């Protein structure tokens, strides 16, 4: 995994940290054998829940540590893992300052105690290490309780580990930043970063009838509206018009059977849904019913501001996004960014007609 970094004059005028003070951090989990060769095993469990490695890499390095200066930094984070979700935080409890998400800068910085980052999502942080020479800041992933097991039994509370010694929700060290000599003078973080043209719900062509996509598991495949990927297939309800603004709704109904018997009973899995060729705005979230502690824990770290192309849809949740299909006609993909879910069918084409 790598990054394309796109800039423009508006961004350059902000005076954000640049050069050596602009750090990409690509977070992945992998498994290795005794010869330090990557091991990727595909089995029924991985296919159901997604691959989870037992080693955390940052920019390809395990036990990542970097020397930084006592100055402000721009940290560009990408979750490049197959299926692992991170609940990011500074080890000392310092709030995280978020300045950008998938599609670029936010209108203004926002702060979070924790930051939930699902596969395929990107986020940018502004971090000020000035006056901290000789200290260490560690970016960690805090523990969360994971997701429901199969039937509450067969695989126990740790089933979301898929055989990994690091299940989804395990506490993790991500990267250590060792703060050395004084660096460049710190410019104040602008209170205004960009101007985002907000989509208007009343301009959506389907304002009263959102285009709905039901996410489920049937047997050993993951489906969208009871369909799986076919190379050239586009259903009638997957055709949109160039220039139209639409409401798309992703409904994650996993957790109740799905026709696969014991192997799908009570499976609750999150789905980071990604739409190719567009940037969208998150309109609303309808949380799962009941007192869902996992949802409450992770949703505190959502950043739905700004432009997105990937949104995490939790078990039992419905998420609506506003998306305009502009610039290009043609056939595009939308899919779950859990790579094993995608490979197991949770990917479809949609067509933009001019």
Regions found by a protein language model. Give the residues of each.
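Short, acidic/polar linear motifs in exposed loop/turn regions
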Residues: 81-83, 133, 253-256
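Active-site pocket scaffolds in enzymes
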Residues: 97-109, 206, 210-354
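Histidine-centered copper-binding motifs that mark active-site loops
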Residues: 1-126, 145-152, 156-217, 221, ...
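Short, hydrophobic beta-strand segments
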Residues: 123-131, 321-327
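Short, surface-exposed secondary-structure boundary micro-motifs
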Residues: 9, 30, 78, 128, ...
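Short, surface-exposed ligand- or partner-binding patches at beta-edge/loop junctions that are enriched
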Residues: 130-146, 327-339
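Short beta-strand segments enriched for Tyr within beta-sheet-rich domains
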Residues: 73, 123, 135-138, 246
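Hydrophobic beta-strand core residues of beta-sandwich domains
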Residues: 67-68, 115-117, 131, 238-242, ...
């Amino acid at each position: 995994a790598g990054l394309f970094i796109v800039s423009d004059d508006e961004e350059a005028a902000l005076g954000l940290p640049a050069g050596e003070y602009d750090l990409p951090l690509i977070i992945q989990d992998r498994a290795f054998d005794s010869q330090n060769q990557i091991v990727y095993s595909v089995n029924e469990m991985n296919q159901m829940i997604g691959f989870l490695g037992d080693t955390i890499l940052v920019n390809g390095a395990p036990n990542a540590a970097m020397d930084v200066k006592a100055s402000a930094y721009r940290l560009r984070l990408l979750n490049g893992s197959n299926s692992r979700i991170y609940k990011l935080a500074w080890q000392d409890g310092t709030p995280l300052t978020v300045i950008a998400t998938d599609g670029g800068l936010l209108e203004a910085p926002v702060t979070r105690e924790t930051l939930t980052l699902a596969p395929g999502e990107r986020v940018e942080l502004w971090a000020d290490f000035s006056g901290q020479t000789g200290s260490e800041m560690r970016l960690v992933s805090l523990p969360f309780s994971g997701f429901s097991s199969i039937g509450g039994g067969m695989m126990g509370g740790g089933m979301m580990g898929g055989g990994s010694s690091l299940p989804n929700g395990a506490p993790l060290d991500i990267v250590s930043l060792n703060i050395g000599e004084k660096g460049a003078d710190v410019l104040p973080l602008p209170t205004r970063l960009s101007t985002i043209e907000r989509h208007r719900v009343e301009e959506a062509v389907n304002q009263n009838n959102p285009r709905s996509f039901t996410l489920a598991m049937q047997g050993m495949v993951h489906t969208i509206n009871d369909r799986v990927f076919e190379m050239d297939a586009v259903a009638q309800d997957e055709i949109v018009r160039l220039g139209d603004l639409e409401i798309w709704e992703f409904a994650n109904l996993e957790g109740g059977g799905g026709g696969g018997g014991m192997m799908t009973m009570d499976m609750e899995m999150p789905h980071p849904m990604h739409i190719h060729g567009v940037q969208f705005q998150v309109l609303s979230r309808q949380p799962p019913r009941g007192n869902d502690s996992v949802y409450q824990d992770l949703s505190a770290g959502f950043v739905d501001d700004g432009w997105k192309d990937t949104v995490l849809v939790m078990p039992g949740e419905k998420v609506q996004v506003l998306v305009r299909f502009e610039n290009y006609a043609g056939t595009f993909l939308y899919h779950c960014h859990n790579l094993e879910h995608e490979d197991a069918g949770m990917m479809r084409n949609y067509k933009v007609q001019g």
